[in-house]
Amino acid sequence: MGVTSYTLETTTPVAPTRLFKALVVDSDNLIPKLMPQVKNIEAEGDGSIKKMTFVEGSPIKYLKHKIHVVDDKNLVTKYSMIEGDVLGDKLESISYDLKFEAHGNGGCVCKSIAEYHTKGDYVLKDEDHNEGKKQGMELFKIVEAYLLANPSVYA
């Protein structure tokens, strides 16, 4: 098993606490409202496992995440994708560390690290990561636009 890491920093005019609440704390409710391809997000067991189910006809059927850390004080979350079509037969899991920090005039910089844990001797290709990054940025931009259009939400 190998591990390949990627880092990304994204800036936004949205305050870090608002973005954290939207993308982490209330994502189970907000994401299905903003993204029609997401049917629902359900917590399993004690809530540390979250299953995101996509609508019929979507290229992805479901994703399952294990939540390791949600730190409201430091605006940090850590979780891993542990099941789903995205992993295929080449990935064991993908771990994510996200930190939301104040930046500029009330804005935020979101710092993320993605670690791809591969199966066997598979070597991750940049295009594999780039597809995931593209989808993650799409979600980020949709939530950002919603928060900018609705300044009282999560304020």
Curated annotation (Swiss-Prot):
Keywords, alphabetical: Pathogenesis-related protein, Plant defense
InterPro entries: Bet_v_I/MLP, Bet_v_I_allergen, Plant_def-hormone_signal, START-like_dom_sf
Superkingdom: Eukaryota
GO cellular component, one term: cytoplasm
Family: Belongs to the BetVI family.
Keyword check for RNA-binding: no
Expression induction or repression: By wounding and fungal elicitor.
Xref: SUPFAM superfamilies: Bet v1-like
Species name: Solanum tuberosum (Potato)
Pfam families linked: Bet_v_1
Protein name stated in the entry: Pathogenesis-related protein STH-21
GO terms for biological process, alphabetical: abscisic acid-activated signaling pathway; defense response
GO MF term set: abscisic acid binding; protein phosphatase inhibitor activity; signaling receptor activity
Gene3D superfamilies: 3.30.530.20
